[in-house]
Structures are given as C-alpha cells and as structure tokens.
Amino acid sequence: MSDRLLVLVRHGQSDWNLKNLFTGWKDPDLTEQGVAEAKAAGQKLKTQGFVFDVAFTSALTRAQHTLDLMLTELGQTGLPTTRNLALNERDYGELSGLNKDDARKKWGEEQVLIWRRSYDVPPPGGESLKDTLARTLPYYVQEILPCVLRGERTLVAAHGNSLRALIMVLEKLTPEQILKRELGTGAPVVYRLNADATVASVVDLAG
C-alpha cells in the first residue's frame, strides 16, 4: 500500500508579520524567528522519520525560504520542487503593506474585520478567501493531488490562507469553520489520504 502522504506547512514568521502589516502578495523575507521556525519544522519532520519525494511552494520568498530551510534540515536539498503563484497568499489589494491599526483608522474596525474574517467579501482590489480557494483548489486537484495518490510523499510550504483553502477541502469544513481555523507559522500538518482522496488521518505537529 502506498503512503499517500501530504504535509502542509505555513511559512515561518516574516518581517511584515512582525510589523503587523497586511502582506498578501508583497514579498518580505523571514525574520530570525521565522528562520528558526522553519528549521524547527524540518527537524521535527526528520525526527519523526519523514522523507519526501516532491515539494510544492508559492512564488513568494517567505514560503520558498521556509521550504529550503526545512529541506536542509531533512537532508533533502535536491528534492524536486515546483513553485507556483496558485499557492500564493490571499491578495489583500489596497490593504497590502498597511499596518493593520492604520487600516482600521482609514476604513473603520468593523469594515476591516469583515474583509479579514468573511469568506466571500474581498478588500478593495484584493481577494476574499473564496477567491483564494478558486485559484488554489484547481492547482491542488491538477498538480498536487495526483502526486499524493501515486504514492509520492508530498511537502507543501505555503501561506495561511492558501493552506486554509486546501484544508477546507481536505477536511470538508464549512466557510464558518475554516475562518476559525488558525495555522501557526512553521507548524506541519500531516495528512494521509485514502485512494479516493479523502482524508484517512490528520496530525497537527504544532508545539
């Protein structure tokens, strides 16, 4: 029986996470803490005996750097890796680069909360979580899932909202449930899938 392993990891803390800025498709790198989180994720996976056949990441530096650091810890720096903007973070449009407190002053706390926590209301010029799902899910179905179902042990390093989109489908969550799902930076979530692509087991390696 093939393993059908899929491990999802949110990138380590970025410079803009630290500064409380909306990041989206902007491209800051990891902080020192983010580097440490990524290395720790790789060490955790190695300690538990994980070996991978293929990796996927976004077109953004913070996710790519996280993946590179994990692969170094795993001793798998030559792993075949695909980078694609379909796995990018949700695009925050006009909010991108703004301090979250400044955004609240400009648009009001209630409106900013709606943009951040509603499923289908996008910020000006940006994406809702529903929009993010619309670009992330086809990529998962067409590119990532076939690898997993072939028994290729698959590692994905991406972003809070692009991973939420995948988790929503994997775990069959409602919009209300996925909006409450928090993903820690550098915390692997380990899925094993059945032959029909449903989830056989899920283990969160946070902490």
Curated annotation (Swiss-Prot):
CDD domains: HP_PGM_like. It comes from the Bacteria. Keywords: Gluconeogenesis, Glycolysis, Isomerase. The record marks 159 as: Transition state stabilizer. Pathway: Carbohydrate degradation; glycolysis; pyruvate from D-glyceraldehyde 3-phosphate: step 3/5. Pfam families: His_Phos_1. It is an enzyme of class 5 (isomerase). PANTHER family: PHOSPHOGLYCERATE MUTASE. This is 2,3-bisphosphoglycerate-dependent phosphoglycerate mutase. It comes from Rhodopseudomonas palustris (strain BisA53). The lineage of its organism: Bacteria, Pseudomonadati, Pseudomonadota, Alphaproteobacteria, Hyphomicrobiales.
